[in-house]
Design a protein with these regions (language model features):
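Acidic/polar-rich alpha-helix caps and helix-coil junctions
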Residues: 4-211
Length: 211
């Protein structure tokens, strides 16, 4: 409840030049298809800026909330799940979201979540992993972190297929990743041939699936 992150991560407007091209004005977009990722939005930039790539609104490659959630993940993996929940709640508190200490409470606070086919053993550690799966998505949306989370958890291919299954069936052909991902191969890129030839220590051995 009262989670402010959606309104930050989704931008429902555009800034456009006014008639004399001296300043920008805010124009609301009514259509959902005209909404954009809202992180580092121009709303935070000084009015009248000329170059949107030269302002005081900087891209953050690593945020404190990310560090806190990584610490929560680490505590959970070493068996200290209560401390993991405490740290996760630090992030939720800052966002105005309801603080929780169990997966049941987390689902009650976020009622539109769907069930995951992974992290489903039912023990407390897996329950926290499920909450963390969602929480990192809410907190770090559009920041380039999600793929690496899914890789770290070993569920990238499963997540791609799950997301595909939730889409409109008429759009399935437009989401090829769910069909074409090969587990054990597509987690990594191939090592370029030039690098293999330049480094004898690699023994001409490419990453799995690219031999």
């Amino acid at each position: 409840a009262n989670d402010e992150r959606r309104d930050v991560m989704v931008c429902t407007y555009q800034y456009k030049w006014d008639a004399d091209k001296k300043a920008h004005k805010l124009v609301e977009n009514k259509k959902l298809t005209d909404w954009y990722p809202g992180k580092w939005r121009r709303e935070w930039m000084p009015k009248g800026f000329v170059d949107p790539n030269n302002t005081g609104v900087n891209y953050c490659p690593l945020r404190y909330a990310d560090v806190v959630l990584m610490a929560a993940e680490a505590y959970n993996e070493i068996g200290n799940t209560p401390e993991a929940w405490r740290l996760l709640n630090e992030v939720r508190h800052r966002a105005g979201a309801t603080e929780t200490n169990s997966l049941q409470a987390y689902k009650a606070a976020q009622p539109n979540l769907y069930e995951l086919p992974y992290f489903n053993s039912g023990d407390e550690a897996d329950n926290f992993r499920t909450a963390l799966y969602w929480e990192r998505g809410f907190e770090l949306a559009f920041e380039g972190q999600r793929k690496y989370d899914l890789l770290r958890w070993g569920i990238l291919g499963d997540a791609l297929k799950l997301f595909q299954s939730k889409m409109d069936k008429s759009l399935k052909g437009k989401y090829d990743a769910g069909d074409k991902f090969i587990k054990g191969k597509h987690e990594l890129f191939p090592i370029p041939l030039g690098e293999l030839q330049a480094n004898p220590a690699l023994k001409n051995q490419n990453n799995p699936g690219y031999e």
